[in-house]
C-alpha cells in the first residue's frame, strides 16, 4: 500500500495538489482528533493493507472517530478514494467496508484502487501497475476538482430513516 500511496502522492504533486499525509499508526494516541483535520479538505484517501482480514484496527478507530466527533456537514462534501492492497485475501471486502462507512458518514466515495500483491517487488517491476495508479489518481483528481455529482445511495436513505445520533458535543476525553 505504501508503494501505491507514494505513486499517488507523486501524481498529485505533479497536478499541484496540496497533500497532507497521516499515518494512523504514528497518530494512534490522537486518532480521535484526526477528524478535525478534515475541515479544509476536498478529498481524502483512506488506505490500508489487508494482511489477514478487515480494514485494521486503526482505520476502524479513525472511522469511528469520524462518526462520533467529525463534522458531518463537512464530511458530506468530502470525496473519499479507497486504496486497499492485500497480501492474502480480502481487498474487495475492505474497499466495500471503507466505501459503505464513508457513505454512512454522509461522504462521497469514488472509485479507488485495490489489488492483491504477494510481494511489493511485483508492483515495482511492472510499469503497467504505475500506469494504472496514475490513471486512477487522475480520475480521482478530476472527480474532486470538477465536483462530480454522485447518485444517491440507500445507505443514506436508511441512515436518514432509522438513525439519529444526538450530538452531545463532548470532547474525546469527555466521551471516554
Question: Predicted regions: what is each one?
Answer:
Residues 76-129:
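Short, glycine-/small-residue-rich phosphate/pyrophosphate-handling segment
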Residues 1-71, 131-176:
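N-terminal beta1-alpha1-beta2 submodule of the flavodoxin-like/Rossmannoid cofactor-binding fold
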Amino acid at each position: 500500500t505504501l508503494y501505491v500511496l507514494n505513486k499517488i502522492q507523486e501524481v498529485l504533486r505533479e497536478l499541484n495538489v496540496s497533500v497532507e499525509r497521516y499515518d494512523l499508526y504514528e497518530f494512534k494516541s490522537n486518532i480521535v482528533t484526526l477528524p478535525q483535520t478534515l475541515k479544509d479538505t476536498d478529498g481524502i484517501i483512506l488506505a490500508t493493507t489487508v494482511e489477514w482480514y478487515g480494514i485494521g484496527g486503526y482505520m476502524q478507530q479513525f472511522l469511528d472517530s469520524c462518526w462520533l466527533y467529525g463534522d458531518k456537514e463537512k464530511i458530506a462534501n468530502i470525496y473519499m478514494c479507497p486504496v486497499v492492497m492485500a497480501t492474502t485475501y480480502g481487498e474487495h471486502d475492505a474497499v466495500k467496508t471503507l466505501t459503505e462507512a464513508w457513505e454512512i458518514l454522509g461522504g462521497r466515495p469514488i472509485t479507488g484502487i485495490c489489488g492483491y500483491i504477494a510481494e511489493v517487488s511485483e508492483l515495482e517491476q511492472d510499469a503497467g501497475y504505475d500506469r494504472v495508479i496514475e490513471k486512477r489518481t487522475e480520475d480521482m483528481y478530476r472527480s474532486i476538482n470538477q465536483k462530480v455529482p454522485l447518485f444517491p445511495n440507500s445507505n443514506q436513505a436508511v441512515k436518514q430513516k432509522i438513525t439519529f445520533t444526538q450530538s452531545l458535543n463532548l470532547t474525546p476525553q469527555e466521551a471516554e
